[in-house]
Amino acid sequence: MTLQQEIIQALGAKSYINPEEEIRRSVDFLKAYLKTYPFLKSLVLGISGGQDSTLAGKLSQMAISELREETDDDALQFIAVRLPYGVQADEQDCQDAIAFIKPDRVLTVNIKGAVLASEQALREAGIELSDFVRGNEKARERMKAQYSIAGMTHGVVVGTDHAAEAITGFFTKYGDGGTDINPLHRLNKRQGKQLLAALGCPEHLYKKVPTADLEDDRPSLPDEAALGVTYDNIDDYLEGKTLAPAIAKIIEGWYVKTEHKRRLPITVFDDFWKK
């Protein structure tokens, strides 16, 4: 088995999907988890205005709405959380995503004060954060807020991770990568677009340039610029297509060096890191 085949198998990626079937699969997956643990009453997700959180948010609201109707449990709710750092440049996209999702409840937690306070505390301890590390601080503060909300609402935190993100480890460890349940796992980027199109999402929300937008020195830095490959390259790789060796090498390089992000904390029984 080639490394490409191993990666495709590990991430559950497919070369072709039926969008309607995958929508139903994700919704039923979320419902089944909540039904298994009836003390859980909410799904919590941060909404950024980008493709991934818009899709995960819509699927989460669908799952909650269906389950509430099936069980007559009015306590069930989907909580969409806005988590700006100060003023968000694409705030209108966030509002458009909220309008499309129609969440039961919307909360806004501005993380700037908490991030600055943490940065100042570290500075006083002699640690000056780089812009890149400060970006990770933002991602972790966002996740911290979501877990606090989930803790107070008997909820679980929904993640936006998908195959095209997982393969490159393009997420913050214990930030946006630290979630409870990931309904998009297995899908690549273009397949996520297909699901949103099938759901009637406004095109500008899934055709916009993907960006983590974490760094102050490089605001709205496109994911593809940070990775050195395009999402079309990554999706083609995940669909089993043959890529130029130089492109495949970049993708596989990201996969190998970010393996630790896709695992639980390393123990004496792990040996993947010895490769």
Swiss-Prot record:
- Gene behind this protein: nadE
Q: Name one GO cellular component term.
A: cytoplasm
PANTHER family referenced in this protein's UniProt entry, alphabetically:
NH 3 /GLUTAMINE-DEPENDENT NAD + SYNTHETASE, NH(3)-DEPENDENT NAD(+) SYNTHETASE
Q: Which reaction does it catalyse?
A: deamido-NAD(+) + NH4(+) + ATP = AMP + diphosphate + NAD(+) + H(+)
Q: Which residues bind deamido-NAD(+)?
A: R140, K173, D180, H260, K261
Q: What is its EC number?
A: 6.3.1.5
Q: How does it assemble?
A: Homodimer.
Report if keyword Magnesium is assigned.
yes
Q: Which Pfam families match?
A: NAD_synthase
Q: Does the keyword NADP apply?
A: no
Source organism per UniProt:
Salmonella arizonae (strain ATCC BAA-731 / CDC346-86 / RSK2980)
This one is known as NH(3)-dependent NAD(+) synthetase
Q: Which residues bind ATP?
A: G46, I47, S48, G49, G50, Q51, D52, S53, T160, K189, T211
* Binding, Mg(2+): D52, E165
Report the pathway entry. Cofactor biosynthesis; NAD(+) biosynthesis; NAD(+) from deamido-NAD(+) (ammonia route): step 1/1
Name the GO terms of the biological process aspect.
NAD biosynthetic process
